[in-house]
Curated annotation (Swiss-Prot):
<comment type="pathway">
    <text>Amino-acid biosynthesis; L-methionine biosynthesis via salvage pathway; L-methionine from S-methyl-5-thio-alpha-D-ribose 1-phosphate: step 4/6.</text>
</comment>
<comment type="subunit">
    <text>Monomer.</text>
</comment>
<dbReference type="Pfam" id="PF00702">
    <property type="entry name" value="Hydrolase"/>
</dbReference>
<keyword id="KW-0479">Metal-binding</keyword>
<dbReference type="InterPro" id="IPR027511">
    <property type="entry name" value="ENOPH1_eukaryotes"/>
</dbReference>
<protein>
    <recommendedName>
        <fullName>Enolase-phosphatase E1</fullName>
        <ecNumber>3.1.3.77</ecNumber>
    </recommendedName>
</protein>
<dbReference type="InterPro" id="IPR036412">
    <property type="entry name" value="HAD-like_sf"/>
</dbReference>
<keyword id="KW-0539">Nucleus</keyword>
<keyword id="KW-0460">Magnesium</keyword>
<dbReference type="GO" id="GO:0019509">
    <property type="term" value="P:L-methionine salvage from methylthioadenosine"/>
</dbReference>
<feature type="binding site">
    <location>
        <begin position="141"/>
        <end position="142"/>
    </location>
    <ligand>
        <name>substrate</name>
    </ligand>
</feature>
<keyword id="KW-0486">Methionine biosynthesis</keyword>
<dbReference type="InterPro" id="IPR006439">
    <property type="entry name" value="HAD-SF_hydro_IA"/>
</dbReference>
<comment type="pathway">
    <text>Amino-acid biosynthesis; L-methionine biosynthesis via salvage pathway; L-methionine from S-methyl-5-thio-alpha-D-ribose 1-phosphate: step 3/6.</text>
</comment>
<comment type="function">
    <text>Bifunctional enzyme that catalyzes the enolization of 2,3-diketo-5-methylthiopentyl-1-phosphate (DK-MTP-1-P) into the intermediate 2-hydroxy-3-keto-5-methylthiopentenyl-1-phosphate (HK-MTPenyl-1-P), which is then dephosphorylated to form the acireductone 1,2-dihydroxy-3-keto-5-methylthiopentene (DHK-MTPene).</text>
</comment>
<dbReference type="GO" id="GO:0000287">
    <property type="term" value="F:magnesium ion binding"/>
</dbReference>
<keyword id="KW-0028">Amino-acid biosynthesis</keyword>
Length: 245
């Protein structure tokens, strides 16, 4: 059992592999965005929001590489852009305009009842207890803030957003850089040593620890196994029931 110091004021959680299964993100969300990109672009092609996303997609260096490998110059229409979107998703390229578009597609899917956010069965109870005990819960994920909120608002355990006080994505910095965690602590107006960061990625835990935060690794089913060295370096738990704050 991981014993956090009693002075913990904020629990900062990762999503993928921590609150939510990696398979949900890779086997449900990503394919859903890939399969529905064309229809969404066709439906919203004339909106300012979509026009901006398309412009930003075309400005990516990946677009130049993609276009150079085509037999003919790509056209500027929903079908052509959706093919580029599939290209990005298949290569797991985490670029901002793609994340924005994915978030919008997912928002429609959640609103239509076609998607529900996965959370492990211990998450809702832990969130409720920490919130009741006056401990703030914040989220830090590579997924956009909008996408984070959708997972928790439309989760299989109900709407968990009321438990969450702040959301951070890569706009604040890379998850494996200690400066990002320093900025998060500053944004939360809390000293880093009063923040417990929960993640499944040792490199992220190392960055958070370098910033002065407490850290615990999650060993969820489907997560990459920890090495013996990582087990010695960090505390780890199987689920949130093993965390005491």
């Amino acid at each position: 059992m991981a014993q956090a110091e009693s002075s913990t004021e904020v629990v900062l959680v990762d999503i993928e592999g921590t609150t939510t299964s990696i398979s949900f993100v890779h086997d449900v969300l990503f394919p859903y965005a890939k399969e529905n990109a064309k229809d969404y672009l066709l439906e919203t092609w004339q909106t300012d929001e979509t026009k901006l996303i398309v412009k930003e997609l075309q400005q990516l260096p990946h677009y130049t590489e993609y276009a150079a490998n085509l037999a003919t110059q790509p056209t500027l229409d929903a079908e052509a852009i959706s093919r580029f979107v599939r290209y990005l998703i298949e290569r797991d390229l985490k670029v901002t305009p793609l994340k924005t578009l994915q978030g919008l597609i997912w928002a429609k899917g959640y609103a239509d009842g076609q998607l529900r956010g996965h959370v492990y069965e211990d998450v809702a109870g832990a969130f409720g207890k920490w919130h009741q005990d006056g401990i703030r819960i914040a989220v830090y994920s590579s997924g956009s803030v909008a996408a984070q909120k959708l997972i928790f608002q439309h989760s299989i355990a109900g709407d968990l957003l009321p438990h969450l006080s702040a959301h951070f994505d890569t706009h604040i910095g890379h998850k494996q850089q200690s400066e990002s965690y320093t900025k998060i602590a500053e944004s939360l107006q809390v000293q880093p040593q009063h923040v417990l960061f929960l993640t499944d990625v040792p490199q992220e835990a190392a960055a958070a620890r370098a910033a002065g935060m407490l850290t615990t690794l999650l060993e969820r089913p489907g997560n990459a196994p920890l090495s013996e060295e990582e087990r010695k370096k960090f505390s780890s738990v199987a689920d949130f029931t093993g965390i005491v704050v």
